[in-house]
Amino acid sequence: MSRLRIYDDTRPESPLLDTQDGAIIAAELQKIGVTFERWQATAPVAPGASQEEVFAAYRADIDRLVAERGFKSVDVASIAPDNPNRAELRRKFLDEHFHKEDEVRFFVAGSGLFTLHVGDKVYEIECVKDDLIAVPDGTTHWFDMGDEPSFVAIRFFTEPDGWVGHFTGTDIAQKFPRYVPTQAS
């Protein structure tokens, strides 16, 4: 189940809010310009599935979003717990960074933790299968897939180059707990 925890950015041990209610998650994130929606992942795909398999399963949804929002590039992050490069892949996203475009992800399997740093608050969003999240450009954040990553997310970009992170150089991400999934997705 999706989960949102909100913290003061100096108090990682004490959440100000901890909820699994989808309506509350969406409302709290909307306050900071983040879109959170529950969709239906209609085609079964397993973590580790190829980009081609995921594209084939979700072609209609991908085409619709590209047409509606003007995305120029789409790819798939699909990582299974037995991936030999999982530790390296995890490290790539663990430090605070931002993008010069919205970060839009649709989770079609598994789960991962987006952590946003907005003002003096930290928002941890556990995204699971059926979650769509759109983080506005310029929002500082990090992503943790856990020690044994198990997820498939379709990633949408307005820039043709795809994922380009601009790292802030702060250590805030190290001050917050690492991701341990609350459910098997």
Swiss-Prot record:
Pathway(s) per entry: Amino-acid biosynthesis; L-methionine biosynthesis via salvage pathway; L-methionine from S-methyl-5-thio-alpha-D-ribose 1-phosphate: step 5/6
GO biological process annotation, one example: L-methionine salvage from methylthioadenosine
Cofactor dependency: Fe(2+); Ni(2+)
Ligand binding (Ni(2+)): H97, H99, E103, H141
Keywords: Amino-acid biosynthesis, Dioxygenase, Iron, Metal-binding, Methionine biosynthesis, Nickel, Oxidoreductase
Residues at the site labelled May play a role in metal incorporation in vivo: E96
Important to generate the dianion (site feature) positions: R105
Coiled coil: none
PANTHER family listed in its UniProt record: ACIREDUCTONE DIOXYGENASE (PTHR23418:SF0)
HAMAP family: Salvage_MtnD
Name of the protein in its database record: Acireductone dioxygenase
Organism whose genome encodes this protein: Stenotrophomonas maltophilia (strain R551-3)
Gene that this sequence comes from: mtnD
